[in-house]
Regions:
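Short beta-strand segments that buttress and anchor functional surface loops
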Residues: 49-56, 73-79
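Hydrophobic ligand-binding cavity/cleft-lining segments
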Residues: 1-42, 139, 143
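Short, surface-exposed coil-to-beta transition loops
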Residues: 3-5, 58-62, 82-87
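A generic structural signal for beta-strand entry/edge sites
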Residues: 1-3, 48-50, 70-72, 94-98
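Generic structural detector for well-ordered beta-strands
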Residues: 7-11, 38, 52-54, 63, ...
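A short, structured loop/turn motif at beta-sheet edges
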Residues: 11-15, 65-70, 89-98
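Short amphipathic alpha-helical signal-transduction/dimerization elements
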Residues: 122, 126, 130, 134-141
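Beta-strand/loop substructures that line and gate deep hydrophobic ligand-binding cavities in soluble
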Residues: 76-128
Length: 143
């Protein structure tokens, strides 16, 4: 498995940052690897919402698995080849917020033997997404 964690400090209030990030149709605005993201099931952000996402030439269907309004969401996509599990946590920090983006990419089945080999690529993808996230939230990347 490849694991990536980024933390962004933002002047935006927690509620605002969470509202933006929990709507996965905003993905393409901050992650340069995402070319499109459209909600295909559900009525706005929340548990069970589904999004069709085109990322790094892969068509994904993300499902929001856990949702704690204003604080945390977990969403997952699974293809024949890999499973992507992402968690966004937003907490108050002063007048702004701190956002933690935690992503895990696991190759499925026998491909799992190659997990170590994908870590550098996943780090590059994560670094680009983290930079876009910090920029979009008018924040700074702190880890």
């Amino acid at each position: 498995m490849a694991h990536y964690v980024a933390t962004v400090r933002s002047p935006r209030p927690r509620e605002e940052a969470f509202a933006y990030l929990s709507d996965l149709s905003n993905f393409e605005q901050w992650d340069p690897g995402v070319s499109s993201s459209t909600q295909v099931s559900g009525d706005g952000p929340g548990p069970g919402a589904e999004y069709a996402v085109r990322a790094n030439r892969a068509d994904l269907r993300y499902v929001v698995e856990q949702y704690r309004a204003g604080h945390e969401l977990t969403f997952k996509a699974r293809t024949r080849f890999f499973t992507s599990l992402d968690r966004v946590t937003v907490v108050d920090e002063g007048e702004g917020s701190r956002v933690v983006y935690d992503a895990v990419l696991t190759l499925n089945g026998p491909l799992g033997l190659l997990d170590v080999a994908i870590r550098p690529m996943f780090r590059r993808i994560g670094d680009a997404a983290a930079a876009g996230l910090a920029d979009t939230l008018d924040g700074e990347l702190i880890t």
